[in-house]
Structures are given as structure tokens and as C-alpha cells.
């Protein structure tokens, strides 16, 4: 059994240690938590970091974690939707009440009040088409983990945008999460990526048990049946695992600094993303190698992303508010 730490608690440390960098959660799994407590943690973190945090949510897909929290996995989808609605309601109103299937909340108010509008920076993980539809209808931005060919990801994003628009929301550009392996030579980058992304791929299956197909029978997770078939084929032979790892490496940001820039530009063109979450440490990659990976990217790739107009993107909405509004954040309800 393995349970995850509270994201806002960890980020409060970084909020106190930094002044300018953006912070973010990926992800808060809402079905595991009391939504009023989540809203309070978000509000306090918003105060501590000065409106610098982007909040990512998800519904989770690991049965071992649901068992640890003693929550039926079949309730994940309706619990997520109801909890998400409560969190938004709590942060966007001076006081609120709620009567639902899972939560009955008498009129209450969140203190401290957030100093910005964090609910306008809500994103949610969309690994499956079902999740993308839920997030679109809620009006959340989409946080997409790159596990498909980029044109397929673009199709999923277009579908999300269409559903969000139909639901009366203005869809935001997606945030893309990808692994990055940057090295001085393509050979070195690919060798490192193949080894450690392959191990990451295996660890994902070990944790989520995708290959055994159990999720296909869980209400709300039926679409994961296709994933089970894919993993079963991968695990059938060493050759299949090699091909699968090659494919996984091909859809990440892997190569020399120049290659990384070209791939990020293509990913931005294909998906319309305005923010990239780069994972530099994966699959047991030794800390020293992860640091070299990150520093090379920071030295050779990041400066170009920062100064080249082709990569320019707008700021996240509603980051800060006037100082006078800060004075009342701890006022009693």
C-alpha cells in the first residue's frame, strides 16, 4: 500500500524559499480528500506564494492508492466532479454551502481568502478521453502527459476544446508534461533515455497494474481496457519491449540542445501549448546525471525559450491583486 503526500504542504516550503518561479501541483487527486480542506490549503498557499501557483488535479488510476485511502474506485469519477465543484465554489464565493451525494456542507467560508483567483489557474490531468471530457465540462485547463504520437495528442486537445466551448467555457492552451533528456550528443541522449525511460515505463505498469486489465472492469475506467491490451503486447517479448521503449523515447524531448529546441517548437505548434512541464529525473536516473541533464537544458535551451519571440506565451490569468485586497484575507467570516 502506498499513499501520496499533500501537494500544497510541500509547495508551501518552496513558496517560502523562492520569490519569482512559478509553482504547481501535478496532481492533487481530489477523490482522496475533503474538498473544503483542499480549498483551504489552496487559499493559504496562494497567500504564501503571492499568486504564483498553478493547481493541477486528477482522479487517479492506481487501485493500491484507492485501497490505502479506503475509497471505492468505482466512485472516483462522481467524487472528483463533486469535489471539484466544491473547491471552485469555496474559492470564488465569500461563503458557500453544498448538498450532494458525497458531501453535505453547511454554510461556511474559507479563511484566509486567496489573494488572487486561483480557480482560474486550475488544470486537470487527462490521460484518458473520459477524463478530458470531464475537465472540459468543468472548465478546467488540460494537463496532458505525452504518451501518444503528437498528432494524436493534438486531436485529443481539439476534442477537449470543442467540448469546453460547447459547455460555455473559454478553453485555455494546454500544459504539456514530458520527459526531457538533453545531452551533448544524440547518441548519449538516446542511450540514457532508452535505459531510464524504459525503466520508468516498467515502473508505471508495476504501480498501476495496467497490463493485467483490471481497470477495464472498473466503472469510470473502461477506456483503460485498450491500455491493458497495449501493455500485454509489450510484455509479451523482449523485442516488443524494445519497440515500445523506442516509441516512448520518440515522443519525449530527447537529443542535443538544438534537437530539444526543435522538438519543443514542433510540440508547441502541434498542441498549441503555452506551458511545458519538463521532467529531468526519471526511471532511477542517478542524481548526478539528472543534474547534468537539467543544467545543460538550463544553459543551452532555456535562454532561447525565454528570449525567442517564437516561444512567447501570455502570463497565467489573475496572478496577483492589488495590495489593498490583501488586508482582508484573514478577516473573520
Model-derived segments and spans:
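Glycine-rich, proline-tolerant flexible connector loops at the mouths of alpha/beta enzymes
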Residues: 1-17, 29, 147-150, 279-290
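An alpha-helical appendage that flanks or caps ligand/catalytic pockets
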Residues: 76-110, 151-273, 302, 306-333
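Conserved, mostly hydrophobic/aromatic
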Residues: 14, 45, 87, 122, ...
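N-terminal beta1-alpha1-beta2 module of alpha/beta enzyme domains
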Residues: 1-23, 118-120, 315-324, 328-333
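A conserved active-site cap/scaffold subdomain adjacent to cofactor or substrate pockets
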Residues: 128, 136-144, 148, 157
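Acidic (Asp/Glu)-rich catalytic clusters
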Residues: 11-22, 42-52, 133-137, 161-169, ...
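Flexible, glycine-rich active-site loops centered on histidine and acidic residues
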Residues: 31-102, 142, 148-154, 192-194, ...
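Hydrophobic faces of well-ordered beta-strands that scaffold small-molecule active sites
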Residues: 23-26, 53-57, 122-125, 142-145, ...
Amino acid at each position: 500500500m502506498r499513499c501520496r503526500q499533500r501537494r500544497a504542504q510541500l509547495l508551501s516550503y518552496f513558496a517560502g524559499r523562492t520569490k519569482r518561479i512559478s509553482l504547481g501541483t501535478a496532481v492533487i487527486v481530489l477523490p482522496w480528500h475533503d474538498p473544503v480542506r483542499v480549498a483551504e490549503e489552496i487559499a493559504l498557499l496562494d497567500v504564501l506564494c503571492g499568486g504564483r501557483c498553478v493547481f493541477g488535479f486528477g482522479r487517479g488510476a492506481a487501485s493500491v492508492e484507492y485501497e490505502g485511502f479506503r475509497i471505492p474506485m468505482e466512485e472516483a469519477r462522481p467524487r472528483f466532479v463533486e469535489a471539484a465543484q466544491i473547491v471552485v465554489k469555496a474559492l470564488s464565493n465569500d461563503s458557500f454551502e453544498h448538498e450532494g451525494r458525497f458531501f453535505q456542507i453547511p454554510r461556511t467560508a474559507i479563511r484566509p481568502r486567496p489573494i488572487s483567483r486561483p480557480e482560474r489557474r486550475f488544470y486537470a490531468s487527462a490521460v484518458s478521453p473520459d477524463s478530458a471530457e470531464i475537465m472540459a465540462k468543468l472548465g478546467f485547463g488540460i494537463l496532458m502527459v505525452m504518451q501518444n504520437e503528437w498528432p494524436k495528442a493534438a486531436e485529443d486537445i481539439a476534442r477537449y476544446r470543442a467540448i469546453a466551448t460547447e459547455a460555455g467555457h473559454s478553453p485555455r492552451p494546454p500544459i504539456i508534461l514530458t520527459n526531457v533528456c538533453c545531452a551533448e550528443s544524440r547518441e548519449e541522449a538516446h542511450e540514457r533515455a532508452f535505459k531510464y525511460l524504459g525503466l520508468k515505463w516498467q515502473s508505471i505498469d508495476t504501480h498501476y497494474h495496467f497490463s493485467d486489465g483490471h481497470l477495464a472492469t472498473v466503472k469510470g475506467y473502461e477506456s483503460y481496457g485498450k491500455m491493458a491490451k497495449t501493455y500485454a503486447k509489450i510484455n509479451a517479448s523482449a523485442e516488443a519491449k524494445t519497440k515500445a521503449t523506442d516509441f516512448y523515447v520518440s515522443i519525449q524531448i530527447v537529443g542535443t540542445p538544438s534537437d530539444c529546441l526543435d522538438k519543443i517548437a514542433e510540440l508547441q505548434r502541434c498542441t498549441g501549448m503555452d506551458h511545458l512541464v519538463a521532467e529531468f529525473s526519471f526511471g532511477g536516473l542517478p542524481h548526478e546525471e539528472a543534474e547534468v541533464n537539467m543544467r545543460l537544458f538550463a544553459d543551452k535551451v532555456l535562454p532561447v525559450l525565454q528570449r525567442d519571440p517564437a516561444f512567447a506565451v501570455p502570463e497565467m490569468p489573475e496572478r496577483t491583486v492589488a495590495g489593498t485586497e490583501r488586508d482582508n484575507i484573514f478577516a473573520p467570516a
